[in-house]
Amino acid sequence: MRAVVQRVDGASVVVEGENGPETVGEINGEGLCVLVGVTHDDTEEKAAQLARKLWSVRMLADEKSCSDIDAPLLVISQFTLYGDARKGRRPTWNAAAPGDVAEPLVDEVVARLRALGATVATGRFGAQMRVSLTNDGPFTVLIEN
């Protein structure tokens, strides 16, 4: 699994609904915006490890973690994190897990975070999303497991 983790001061995800734009996930104030990519050999245990790391990583102000101050997380699936653009002009997605593999693992990350006590908002798996955030720092970290 691969996660791009950004310290934010608020973030939201909007998708196009039947009646226009619909906000499907939002966090207010200090927290983390997490883009999660899944590859073929990822497992529920890797999802659990990632959740524990996200809950405890000290990326917030004063070297605090989300668990220290009950800061929220916005978790968004993003298969393009496993894109490969080394050859040619068009990325390939061979390393990205298909949706039927990836979706339950992203859901597992969210479920594990919530089980740890986290407040978690999410995007909508497979949807075209507009993500808005106020990057704080900026402070961005890549986590792989």
UniProtKB/Swiss-Prot annotation:
Belongs to the DTD family. The keyword Nucleus does not apply. Keywords: Cytoplasm, Hydrolase, RNA-binding, tRNA-binding. A Gly-cisPro motif from one monomer fits into the active site of the other monomer to allow specific chiral rejection of L-amino acids. NCBIfam families: D-aminoacyl-tRNA deacylase. This is D-aminoacyl-tRNA deacylase. Homodimer. The lineage of its organism: Bacteria, Bacillati, Actinomycetota, Actinomycetes, Kitasatosporales. GO terms for cellular component: cytoplasm. A motif (Gly-cisPro motif, important for rejection of L-amino acids) lies at residues 137-138. CDD domains: Dtyr_deacylase. It is found in: Cytoplasm. The gene is dtd. GO terms for molecular function: D-tyrosyl-tRNA(Tyr) deacylase activity; Gly-tRNA(Ala) deacylase activity; Ser(Gly)-tRNA(Ala) hydrolase activity; tRNA binding. It is an enzyme of class 3 (hydrolase). An aminoacyl-tRNA editing enzyme that deacylates mischarged D-aminoacyl-tRNAs. Also deacylates mischarged glycyl-tRNA(Ala), protecting cells against glycine mischarging by AlaRS. Acts via tRNA-based rather than protein-based catalysis; rejects L-amino acids rather than detecting D-amino acids in the active site. By recycling D-aminoacyl-tRNA to D-amino acids and free tRNA molecules, this enzyme counteracts the toxicity associated with the formation of D-aminoacyl-tRNA entities in vivo and helps enforce protein L-homochirality.
